[in-house]
Curated annotation (Swiss-Prot):
Keywords: Cytoplasm, Decarboxylase, Lyase, Porphyrin biosynthesis. It is found in: Cytoplasm. It comes from Erwinia tasmaniensis (strain DSM 17950 / CFBP 7177 / CIP 109463 / NCPPB 4357 / Et1/99). The lineage of its organism: Bacteria, Pseudomonadati, Pseudomonadota, Gammaproteobacteria, Enterobacterales. This is Uroporphyrinogen decarboxylase. Its EC number is 4.1.1.37. It comes from the Bacteria. One of its GO terms (biological process) is protoporphyrinogen IX biosynthetic process from glutamate.
Length: 355
């Protein structure tokens, strides 16, 4: 594969020296870009876009043409694994993802298969290979998966939820059933991410979107425990380079020490966690990614620049910081504001990396 021209994202994840702080945005390929909307219209619907390697590649590359981003992220969805398990993923207009056959009892869990990433999820690997080829070594490609706990929330609730009552009922009334399910999901995610790495992903990220709804004890038992298992099973080197692993629990700022102890390389932070405090707590063990509030991109470019300056100052001098939003970019953000954000990160971070 072609030589990597810009590796500052990978270097920052491994806490190695960089010239400026690298930056990318969660959901950087998305509905805030008019060219994304046009490509999605060609595909017909969201999953058709994910399953067409050429179109998935096109939307992955679109933000890189506009902005000097330091990484590309695979265009896909966290729910590909439950879909491949036969739960019947579909999207309701205005409702988000739904499953036609949610998991309701132990028998449902027992019959869940562990998908073969090169068969049932082969379309994802085709997208990874196509994107990696078309990136031509410009920037690294990030692969990703949802965490077992987060996947379980959708599989048991049948879609998005605010209170997670069905899953929490299973967790408290039938913990062994949930553990069996999470174990299968951890095995599935490990196979899936390793297949992405073999197909060309140069870094991987585990999105634990809903870990923050748990108590501390339950988070360790039902979420972090299974992410730790995945980290232990991942390929950590490919193509002669370390493959960094980032864990991101939204609302998980109180558990950073435990997360860092999993052996991952970096932690994603949402905007509710103070970056300076996070660095004091775990910065000698892992890199940190984040953490501007995505809603800040509605502000003027001057206000965005001010916020970027404050976050850079919070992290301070030295290595080990990847700038990002604290969650995905909103769909109605002006594209030029995202551009002002990326430009400000590079320009304002340079003094923090001198000497």
């Amino acid at each position: 594969m072609s030589e990597l021209k810009n590796d500052r994202y990978l270097r920052a994840l491994l806490r190695q020296p960089v010239d400026v702080t690298p930056v990318w945005m969660m959901r950087q390929a998305g509905r805030y870009l008019p060219e994304y909307k046009a490509t999605r219209a060609v595909a017909g619907d969201f999953m058709s876009l994910c399953k067409n390697a050429e179109l998935a590649c096109e939307v992955t590359l679109q933000p890189l043409r506009r902005y000097a981003l330091d990484a590309a992220i695979l265009f896909s969805d966290i729910l590909t694994i439950p879909d491949a398990m036969g739960l019947g993923l579909y999207f309701e207009t205005g409702e988000g993802p739904r499953f036609s056959s949610p998991v309701t009892c132990r028998a449902d869990v027992e019959k869940l298969p562990i998908p073969d990433p090169e068969q049932e999820l082969g379309y994802v690997m085709n997208a990874v290979r196509t994107i990696r080829k078309n990136l031509n070594g410009e920037v690294p490609l990030i692969g990703f998966s949802g965490s077992p706990w987060t996947l379980a929330t959708y599989m048991v609730e049948g879609g998005s939820s605010k209170a997670f009552t069905k899953l929490k009922k299973m967790m408290y009334a039938e913990p062994q059933t949930l553990h069996l399910m999470l174990d299968k999901l951890a095995d599935s995610v490990t196979l899936y991410l390793n297949a992405q790495i073999r197909a060309g992903a140069q870094s991987v990220m585990i999105f634990d979107t809903w870990g923050g709804v748990l108590t501390g004890r339950d988070y360790l038992e039902f979420s972090l425990n299974y992410m730790h298992k995945i980290v232990d099973g991942l390929l950590r080197e490919n193509d002669g380079r370390r493959v960094p692993v980032t864990l991101f629990t939204k609302g998980g700022g109180q558990w950073l020490e435990a997360m860092a102890a999993t052996g991952c390389d970096a932690l994603g932070l949402d905007w509710t966690t103070d970056l300076a405090d996070a660095r004091r707590r775990v910065g000698d063990r892992v890199a940190l990614q984040g953490n501007m509030d995505p809603s800040m991109l509605y502000a003027s470019p001057a206000r965005i620049e001010q916020e970027v300056a404050g976050i850079l100052e919070g992290y301070g001098h030295g290595n080990g910081h990847v700038f990002n939003l604290g969650h995905g970019i909103h769909q109605d953000v002006p594209p030029e504001h995202a551009g002002a954000f990326v430009e400000a990160v590079h320009r304002l971070s340079r003094p923090y990396h001198l000497g």
